[in-house]
């Protein structure tokens, strides 16, 4: 299976200059490709009849559609912007200095652009989900995050070795890294990113499945805001140690908001603005590192103890909880599910997803009665019966339990 490992790079001065140059080159390729893409699209809209454009679009799926000679000539003169069209044009337009740089950077930039356009148009077709995919835009050198991608990187003598052009005559070294002990060999995919003047590499490696010993144990995990409950206890997703970081984030966000406005108008981005933005990103990075570390340890421990795990298939986007929304996103429901899914495959364990409409909170784990109408438990408890948010009382059999414990037992029943 493919696993992604993110490591911190420690390049020497020579390779640091090389990485900076490759980041600049990738941004140049992206902007050039976007300009060509938009030009081809505009020419196609202006010179091709709408019925011919529709016919060409249908021909992508239906190969039996035939074109007349004049239609073929028009389509050849004004091709559709695709990965192959744009990358071919950029390759023909290469300047001498570009041959000193790896060609994979250009092709990967065009590939990312094609995927970005595809995601943008797919999001516009969705009718039920929120459209949150923006149109591809030109990249600025002032962006806090820069990077490039390649599929020809290797690990040699515990160092990351990037591919270089055959005519490049300058010095080239392996780059030391920290984060994981990786075996020597080829890497399927490598993404280099520069964040806050630090370089990181995300390496996609084909990793064999490491089956853990059988324990014949089962558990269920009920995801709640700020904590996850399971059969042996509770796991805090947002511990107290993050409170100070969230206060710093709030402080830097307010500073940035003030620096965006000057005399009621949009202000220019000053050096101080980018300094504050860098500090804000460092705080976000620390929060992410802390929570990722905790989640990795928790999910790995779960699969070492249990063979079968049941979790809820939560629709986070549809969960509107007013004041709870911020804490909801901080609870990392989506990231938790992602970790559980890939580790189940990695360790050879079974992961069961409960239907998102399964009433684990309203169902009695003792008799199976499901609360409806005014009997339901809400975020404020139950006004009709005077119960609190964390209390579960079955009005049919009289069973009383903690609300989260009752939900865990209902989820656990799905493993039978």
Regions found by a protein language model. Give the residues of each.
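Nucleic-acid substrate recognition interfaces
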Residues: 1-416
């Amino acid at each position: 299976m493919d696993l992604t490992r993110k490591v911190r790079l420690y390049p020497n001065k020579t390779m640091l200059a090389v990485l900076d140059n490759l980041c600049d080159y990738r941004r140049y390729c992206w902007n050039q490709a976007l300009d060509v893409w938009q030009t081809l699209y505009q020419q196609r809209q202006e010179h091709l009849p709408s019925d011919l454009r529709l016919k060409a679009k249908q021909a992508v799926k239906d190969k039996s559609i035939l074109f007349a000679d004049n239609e073929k000539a028009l389509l050849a003169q004004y091709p559709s912007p695709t990965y192959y069209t744009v990358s071919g044009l950029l390759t023909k337009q290469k300047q001498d200095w570009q041959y000193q740089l790896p060609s994979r950077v250009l092709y990967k930039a065009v590939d990312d652009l094609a995927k970005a356009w595809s995601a943008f148009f797919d999001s516009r077709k969705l009718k039920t989900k929120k459209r949150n995919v923006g149109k591809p835009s030109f990249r600025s050198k002032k962006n806090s995050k820069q990077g490039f991608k390649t599929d020809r990187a290797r690990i040699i003598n515990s160092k990351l070795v990037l591919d270089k052009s055959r005519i490049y005559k300058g010095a080239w070294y392996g780059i030391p890294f920290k984060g994981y002990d990786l075996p020597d060999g080829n890497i399927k995919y490598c993404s280099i990113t520069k964040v806050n003047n630090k370089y990181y590499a995300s390496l996609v490696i084909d990793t064999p499945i490491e089956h853990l010993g059988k324990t014949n144990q089962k558990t269920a995990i009920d995801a709640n805001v700020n904590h996850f409950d399971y059969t042996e206890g509770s796991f805090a997703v947002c511990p107290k140690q993050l409170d100070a970081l969230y206060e710093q984030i709030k402080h830097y966000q307010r500073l940035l908001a003030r620096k965006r406005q000057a005399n009621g108008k949009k202000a220019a981005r000053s050096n101080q603005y980018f300094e504050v933005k860098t500090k804000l990103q460092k705080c976000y990075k620390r929060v992410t590192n802390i929570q990722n570390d905790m989640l990795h340890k928790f999910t790995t421990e779960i699969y070492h103890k249990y063979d079968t795990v049941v979790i809820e298939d939560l629709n986070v986007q549809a969960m509107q909880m007013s004041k709870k929304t911020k804490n909801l996103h901080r609870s990392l429901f989506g990231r938790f599910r992602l970790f559980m899914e890939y580790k189940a495959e990695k360790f050879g364990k079974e992961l069961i997803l409960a239907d998102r409409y399964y009433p684990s909170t309203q169902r009695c784990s003792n008799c199976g009665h499901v609360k409806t109408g005014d009997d339901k438990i809400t975020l404020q408890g139950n006004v009709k019966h005077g119960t609190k948010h964390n209390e579960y009382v079955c009005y049919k059999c009289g069973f009383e339990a903690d609300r989260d414990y009752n939900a865990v037992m209902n989820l656990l029943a799905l493993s039978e």
